[in-house]
Amino acid sequence: MPNQNLIALGFDFGMKRIGVAVGQTVTHSANAIAILKAQDGVPDWEKIKMLIETWHANVLVVGIPYNMDGSEQTLTFAARKFARKLQTRFGLPVSMVDERLTTIEAKRQWYEQGLTKRPQHLDNYAAKLILEQWLQEQKNE
């Protein structure tokens, strides 16, 4: 998808919460925008549809969790299933990104900003990092 101005929504999938970020390929920047509740990994599809329409997203990016050794875990399969359902429901291209260490990096950035209160949820910050990684890959193509 090089040489296109794309607006992307990035997702940090979880069984209870799904972090969402928005970014675009013109500036290769992303912003955390929402944390959606999920019930056993099932999101509120209408809220996702609303975010896609509000931001005029034309590509979706899902973080896929792996163990540090690269092996897969239960959540790996659930995140892939979520990515497939996004593609089927909304007919948009979906990219998957290795999301190892994004939550740790999100915490580091949180405290680096001088925010001392422990964050309750970092899912949307993790989604931002996932999306920034994808945007960097697009820039390098």
UniProtKB/Swiss-Prot annotation:
Entry GO terms, CC: cytosol
Pfam families, per database record: RuvX
Top-level EC class: hydrolase
Major site of localization recorded for this protein: cytoplasm
Record bears the keyword Transit peptide: no
InterPro entries to which the protein is assigned, alphabetical: RNaseH-like_sf, YqgF, YqgF/RNaseH-like_dom, YqgF/RNaseH-like_dom_sf
SMART domains: YqgFc
Role this protein plays: Could be a nuclease involved in processing of the 5'-end of pre-16S rRNA.
Sequence similarity: Belongs to the YqgF nuclease family.
Protein's name according to its UniProt entry: Putative pre-16S rRNA nuclease
Protein species of origin: Coxiella burnetii (strain Dugway 5J108-111)
